[in-house]
UniProtKB/Swiss-Prot annotation:
Function: Catalyzes the irreversible NADPH-dependent deamination of GMP to IMP. It functions in the conversion of nucleobase, nucleoside and nucleotide derivatives of G to A nucleotides, and in maintaining the intracellular balance of A and G nucleotides.
Protein's UniProt name: GMP reductase
KW Metal-binding (keyword) present: yes
Broad class of enzyme this protein falls into: oxidoreductase
PANTHER family recorded: GMP REDUCTASE
Length: 348
């Protein structure tokens, strides 16, 4: 047993230090990034925010809506191949280039991924997703997927430390998904005691990945636009959002009427709700590591994503970054013990 004494930080522990800026308006900030990926050699241009591959977030409807903003969607893995075929027929190329095909690591998942990727050459992103990215099986599976799809962009995770980040990139991942336990409906940290403060995870994994020419997705932990900016400032190439994009008409969640109000069900992908729906319940050897909540119905996602991107633009103006690419270079975090004045609580 050993204890690491170094302080690890989450988004709530820091604020940006403002810096002199020549920008006159948020409208001058460019949030589009141009990436060339290490293994596939593929190029992509867009706003590097991703809707999470959760049942009640990463839907086909969400993909079409967010593509209008240049934003990506990691479509959840529970759609059938026929569902994908219908989507590919109805979606334009601008949408398809901003979609990730999510998969698990079984032989059936591998065959399903092959069938989906064969539907269109415009599908270029594969998201290999398991809760514990420290499994040797994941490394072997990434190698298998890379051998089958040498020209596709592969994301794999989730991990929170530089060593495993490097191993996945060397195995063939272009992007590593970073985050264990920070999600709004994730209970892994309290159920298992395992986790890592998200900002420190992003900083450390980003440093490791960039040293090898790879990239990272900061997955989870964002509760407001300022957190999205902090993830980018800490070195995330992409930021994945679940709870912030849940509860919308495009989210695909179950709508529930209660006491005259409309709610949408939102749950973690290791929750009792998810396992009841997709796995016939929680296996005897497992424990649920997610919770189910009812969110007030929030209408269309367009207003929400515009608000998030507007917040990130505003961050850039405060620190003098004309492009999102410059944000991490312009970032100085200060440690704090408070974030906001809560005299009046949340706005109704």
């Amino acid at each position: 047993m050993r204890i690491e004494q170094e302080l690890k930080l989450g988004f709530k522990d820091v604020l940006f230090r403002p810096k002199r800026s020549t920008l006159k308006s948020r409208s001058q900030v460019n949030l589009t990034r141009d990436f060339t990926f290490k293994h596939s050699g593929r190029q992509w241009s867009g706003v590097p925010v991703i809707a999470a591959n959760m049942d009640s977030v990463g839907s086909f409807e969400m993909a079409k809506a967010l593509a209008e903003h240049g934003v990506m969607t990691a479509v959840h893995k529970h759609y059938t191949v026929n569902d994908w075929a219908d989507f590919v027929k109805s979606a334009d190329n601008a949408t398809l280039k901003n979609v990730m095909v999510s998969t698990g690591t079984s032989d059936a998942d591998f065959q399903k991924t092959k069938d989906i990727m064969a539907l269109s050459d415009e599908l270029i992103f594969i998201c290999v997703d398991i809760a514990n990215g420290y499994s040797e099986h994941l490394v072997e599976y990434v190698e298998r997927v890379r051998a089958e799809f040498p020209d596709k962009v592969i994301s794999a995770g989730n991990v929170v430390t530089g060593d495993m980040c490097e191993e996945l990139i060397l195995a063939g991942a272009d992007i590593v998904k970073v985050g264990i336990g920070p999600g709004s409906v994730c209970t892994t940290r309290v159920k298992t005691g395992v986790g890592y403060p998200q900002l420190s995870a992003i900083i450390e994994c980003g440093d490791a990945a960039h040293g090898l020419g790879g990239m990272i997705i900061g997955d989870g932990g964002c509760s407001c636009a300022g957190d999205v900016s902090k993830a980018f400032g800490g070195g995330a190439d992409f930021v994945m959002l679940g709870g912030m994009l849940a509860g919308h008409e495009e989210s695909g969640g179950e709508i529930i009427e209660k006491d005259g109000e409309t709610f949408m069900k939102f749950y973690g992908m290791s929750s009792q709700s998810a396992m009841d729906k997709h796995s016939g319940g929680v296996a005897k050897y497992r424990a649920a590591e997610g919770k189910t909540v009812l969110l007030p119905f929030r209408g269309s996602v367009h207003g929400t994503i515009s608000d998030i991107l507007g917040g990130v633009r505003s961050t850039c103006t405060y620190v003098g970054a004309a492009k999102l690419k410059e944000l991490t270079k312009r970032t100085t975090f200060i440690r704090v013990q408070e974030q906001e004045n809560n005299v009046f609580g949340k706005e109704k």
